Each structure stands twice: as C-alpha cells, then as structure tokens.
C-alpha cells in the first residue's frame, strides 16, 4: 500500500501489534456507508499509539477509495487564536478533500495554507467548482473576523459538503482535548473559549 499521509511512526513496517484495533475501526468506517456507525473516541494515555492508528486509518481509507472520504486533523497543543485555528482547520480539510477527489497526494502538503484565492483557483482547476462558494464564505468571515459565523461555517464544512455532494466524510480529530486552548476575541483582549468541542463529530 502507498502512504498518502506521512506517518510519524517512521517506516510503515514499524506499525505492529494493532491488528485488532485496525480491524475494529476499519469495520466501523465501512459501516458508515450504511449509516450504522456513530461518533467514537479513542482514549488512552499519551504515547500509546492513538495518532499512529488514525494516520494509518487515513492512509488505508484514502487508497481504498471505497465511498468514504477521510479527513485527519491534529489540534495543536499551543494556544491559538480562534480565527487562525479555523483557517488552519479549513485549509487542511479542503486540501485533503481535493487530494482525495483528484488522487493527487501532493495536495496533502500544500505550499501555502493562507491564500484563499489560490485555494479557490485550485478547486476550479480540478473541476471542483462547487467548493468555491464555501471558500469565499470562509475567506469573508476571516477577513472581517466574524468569529461566530466563521466557527460555524468551518465546523460544519465537512458535513455541508458531504450533504450537498451526497458523499460520506470521515472526520478524525487528533488531540481534541487541546480545543480548550483555542482563544477568542480580538488580539488585544483574548478570553479562553469554553465548551466548544462541538467541532468533533
């Protein structure tokens, strides 16, 4: 199997002893197609291989190309302004989505994750014009710091696109406990965001 997403475990053969967990989650992913799967969480102490499992699940699902589009996002441990977080989350999702639809893995590591015009142009180039509307909407919300609108648009982006295109998108949010470190408000007066983990589906 080719590996679209670089796995931090190192060489792929270093991923061992996870057959039972992989089998469980691969069945869970397959059951998404029949709407039998529900949101779930992987809970374990640090350095127990949660990230390795999710990265491997992404790669398997990406190359299996069997009706489920994978999206993997790692929440950073450092504090992040909500607008910056939303932009990073959105760009990561859209680039991964385009990579899956086009089978072009280079889009998983874009050179620029801040240029909305370039992102929109790429969507058009790849025949995914339906993405330009939501890209423009998020760009407007970022520019004018419409935080509530931005948060809702970005949080719902995978679900919105999946619904409109009659597709299935699997969201894998790694280190979601760090969502509590996201901060809102303007850059002069920052307050911690509370109870906003609804971005995890």
Regions found by a protein language model. Give the residues of each.
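Soluble or luminal CAZymes and related metallo-dependent hydrolases
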Residues: 17-21, 146-154, 195-198
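P-loop NTPase nucleotide-binding core
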Residues: 38-40, 44-188
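Substrate-engagement module of ASCE P-loop NTPases
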Residues: 157-162, 191-201
């Amino acid at each position: 199997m080719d590996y679209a997403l670089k796995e931090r475990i190192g060489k792929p053969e270093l991923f061992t002893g996870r057959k039972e967990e992989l089998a469980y989650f691969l069945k869970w992913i397959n059951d998404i197609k029949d709407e039998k799967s529900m949101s779930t969480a992987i809970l374990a102490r640090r350095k127990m291989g949660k990230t390795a499992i999710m990265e491997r699940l992404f790669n398997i699902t990406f190359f299996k190309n069997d009706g489920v589009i994978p999206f993997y996002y790692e929440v950073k441990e450092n504090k992040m302004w909500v607008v910056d977080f939303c932009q990073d989350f959105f760009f990561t999702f859209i680039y991964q989505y385009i990579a899956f639809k086009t089978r072009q893995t280079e889009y998983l590591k874009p050179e620029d994750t801040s240029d909305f015009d370039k992102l929109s142009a790429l969507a058009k180039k790849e025949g995914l014009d339906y993405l330009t509307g939501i890209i423009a909407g998020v760009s407007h919300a970022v520019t004018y710091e419409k935080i509530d609108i931005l948060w809702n648009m970005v949080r719902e982006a995978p679900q919105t696109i999946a619904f409109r295109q009659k597709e299935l998108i699997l969201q894998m949010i790694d280190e979601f406990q760090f969502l509590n470190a996201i901060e809102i408000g303007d850059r002069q007066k920052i307050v911690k965001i509370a109870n906003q983990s609804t971005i995890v589906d």
